Amino acid sequence: MTPHEYLSQLLASQEMRDPDLRVIRSLRDELAAFLGRQLGSGPRIYYGGSYGKHTMIREAYDLDLVVYFPPTDARSLAEIFGAVHQALVRGKYVVEPQTVALRLPYEAGFHVDVVPGRALESDFLYATLYKNSNPPSTLKTSLKVHIDAVRKTELRQIVRLLKLWRLRHGIPLKTFALEILAARALAGRRPDDYGTAMWKIFQYMAKEMATVRLQDPANTNNVLDLTVQERSSVAQAAAKSLSAQTWGEILW
């Protein structure tokens, strides 16, 4: 069996089951309907994250919902963030505020991240998010650009493999960073052979992770803040994978 065949089998084993997808869609519909009643018809609600990018793996997934208010909404971003937070609390949801999201925890570690923002234009392509940090700030980005960055570069399956690799090796790195690393390592090459593509990514991580600057493809002014520990963990795991004798030691 070739590395590509082995990795293809792993990907097949991580496909989402129809019952799980139905639960996710039902939950999205429930939240969208609730927020529509609470917030009115102005905001648009989109799938974000792994569902929007089609990069879910069965063993570890969650749901991102983006709530973009129209550019005509005169409230501050802090007020918009607060309005969505208050609406969820009124609905008896358990809410854990994150940096740009309102996290709703469910069973078995599953959660929904609700991300409020305000669109910059009427096309809703770009939006500004509120950063719930100290001090508070804002972040301009684009969900649609992030989705296209994965879909149009055909990185979907590679990202799924990297998410499984992260899970197996306990690597503390967000999926968004993995997506950018994959795109940077492959530099426009089509990932037709999964083994070759993953090997190139591991080589790039092992060599460049200590100093690489990861920029948001939707806004190069947004640079991902990676800790020394995160950089070191990724580089060490990549080097370990490169020294493995079989793919079964790297991904299973």
Where are these regions (language model features)?
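Conserved nucleotidyltransferase catalytic core and NTase-mimicking acidic/glycine-rich helix/loop elements
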Residues: 154-252
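A structural motif
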Residues: 115, 121-162
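Generic non-transmembrane alpha-helical segments
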Residues: 30-41, 83-91, 161, 165, ...
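N-terminal regions immediately upstream of nucleotidyltransferase
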Residues: 1-46, 50-58, 73-76
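Short, compositionally biased low-complexity segments
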Residues: 1-12, 55-60, 127-139, 175-177, ...
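Short beta-strand
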Residues: 45, 94-97, 175
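Catalytic metal-binding acidic patch
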Residues: 54-77, 81-84
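Conserved catalytic core of two-metal-ion nucleotidyltransferases
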Residues: 59, 81-123
